[in-house]
From Swiss-Prot:
Keywords recorded for this protein, A-Z: Electron transport, Heme, Iron, Membrane, Metal-binding, Mitochondrion, Mitochondrion inner membrane, Respiratory chain, Transmembrane, Transmembrane helix, Transport, Ubiquinone
Binding site for heme b b562: H84, H183
CDD domains tied to this protein: cytochrome_b_C, Cytochrome_b_N
Cofactor note: Binds 2 heme b groups non-covalently.
Family stated for the protein in its record: Belongs to the cytochrome b family.
Subunit description: The cytochrome bc1 complex contains 11 subunits: 3 respiratory subunits (MT-CYB, CYC1 and UQCRFS1), 2 core proteins (UQCRC1 and UQCRC2) and 6 low-molecular weight proteins (UQCRH/QCR6, UQCRB/QCR7, UQCRQ/QCR8, UQCR10/QCR9, UQCR11/QCR10 and a cleavage product of UQCRFS1). This cytochrome bc1 complex then forms a dimer.
Pfam families per the UniProt record, alphabetical: Cytochrom_B_C, Cytochrome_B
Major subcellular site: mitochondrion
Function summary: Component of the ubiquinol-cytochrome c reductase complex (complex III or cytochrome b-c1 complex) that is part of the mitochondrial respiratory chain. The b-c1 complex mediates electron transfer from ubiquinol to cytochrome c. Contributes to the generation of a proton gradient across the mitochondrial membrane that is then used for ATP synthesis.
Transmembrane region(s): 34-54, 78-99, 114-134, 179-199, 227-247, 289-309, 321-341, 348-368
Name of the protein this chain belongs to: Cytochrome b
Length: 380
């Protein structure tokens, strides 16, 4: 029999073992589609970003006009920009759903895969933040000012840290240039960490909705899941293109149509929608350092999840009490997102504080307690 190049060639062999002959559980649901969707988002963002970078000028006096020029005068420049801006939103929608799936089905028990995933989330957040500054509109400028200023809360070295990040005594040209450099670099770092993420995943194989071993009953990835991934992609592409083509500015801030002006502060400074939950937690603590610590904890808490798993069952499929708590957490995050978009006044302040408190309470206290309670109930 002739040797199969797919299985013998050093490079093709790696692709084959990851995407073609990969043994996969036969019962993974559509919730397992988001990994491939995230990969597609990353590819789309890198390609559109590369095309935008060809027409962008990282200079405070030219950045805003260079983006306007791209949209007006470059062939399909408006389309490339709208795909890139809304692609970021879909990237976050997919990663939030992907993390939600991991929480619900106990995928976090693959600790290395989970931890590299958290690192990916942090890198994605950093990339989105520096990217938002590049068009140099009002919200770009003031968002950069407010968020970089948070570093000054670090005891002793805070102010030095901020000035070092700014490259001066305020957000100015050096800040914009370095943010562009970082925004160009980080997606490739994300691609690298993604490969590590997949390497760890393929060490153990995929989890499944039942949370039990499927080693005795695996099927090849291709054609079963390759076709399912293509279906998932078309289903994501429909709302994505609808948004990017029919209402491209729906998720953006109107303030960003005004060029950056250091002398005029916008009435409400708020980040893009995908950061609002963390922004609400930051604002709910009236102390600067406390707020920064809560902000960091709101994402880094994910690293603790594997250690807070007290249930004898891996997934929540057969745990109705934990399911209720999970959906309570989802509702809580939606409330935080809404609060983050509102001005700092009554009743939003107290709602934000209650929602922030319940966010940490659910994750740190209630999940482990309910897990142990369910174990006890199973014994009776």
């Amino acid at each position: 029999m002739a040797p199969n190049i797919r299985k013998s060639h050093p490079l093709l062999k790696m692709i084959n073992n990851s995407l073609i002959d990969l043994p996969t559980p036969p019962n993974i649901s559509a919730w397992w589609n988001f990994g491939s969707l995230l990969a597609m988002c990353l590819i789309t963002q890198i390609l559109t970003g590369l095309l935008l970078a060809m027409h962008y000028t990282a200079d405070t006096s030219l950045a805003f006009s260079s983006v306007a020029h791209t949209c007006r005068n470059v062939q399909y420049g408006w389309l490339i920009r709208n795909l890139h801006a809304n692609g970021a939103s879909f990237f976050f929608i997919c990663i939030f759903l992907h993390i939600g799936r991991g929480l619900y089905y106990g995928s976090y028990l693959y600790k290395e895969t989970w931890n590299t995933g958290v690192i990916l989330l942090l890198t994605l957040m950093a990339t989105a933040f520096v990217g938002y500054v590049l068009p140099w509109g009002q919200m770009s400028f003031w968002g950069a000012t407010v968020i970089t200023n948070l570093f000054s809360a670090v005891p002793y070295i805070g102010q030095t840290l901020v000035e070092w990040a700014w490259g001066g005594f305020s957000v100015d040209n050096p800040t914009l240039t370095r943010f562009f450099a970082l925004h160009f670099l980080l997606p490739f770092l994300i691609a690298g960490i993604t490969i590590i993420h997949l390497t760890f995943l393929h060490e153990s194989g995929s989890n499944n909705p039942l949370g039990i071993s499927s080693d005795s009953d695996k099927i090849p990835f291709h054609p079963y899941y390759s076709i399912k991934d293509i279906l998932g992609l078309t289903l994501m592409l429909t709302p994505f293109l609808t948004l990017a083509l029919f209402s491209p500015n729906f998720l953006g801030d109107p303030e960003n149509f005004t060029p950056a002006n250091p002398l005029v502060t916008p009435p409400h400074i708020k980040p893009e929608w995908y950061f609002l939950f963390a922004y609400a937690i930051l604002r709910s603590i009236p102390n600067k350092l406390g707020g920064v610590l809560a902000l960091a904890a709101s994402v880094l808490i994910l690293l603790l999840i594997p250690f807070l798993h007290k249930s004898k069952q891996r997934t929540m499929t057969f745990r109705p009490l934990s399911q209720t708590l999970f959906w309570l957490l989802v509702a809580n995050l939606l409330i935080l997102t809404w609060i983050g978009s509102q001005p700092v006044e009554h009743p939003f302040i107290i709602i934000g504080q209650m929602a922030s408190l319940s966010y940490f309470t659910i994750l740190l206290i209630l999940f482990p307690m309910i897990g142990m309670l369910e174990n006890k109930m199973l014994n009776h």
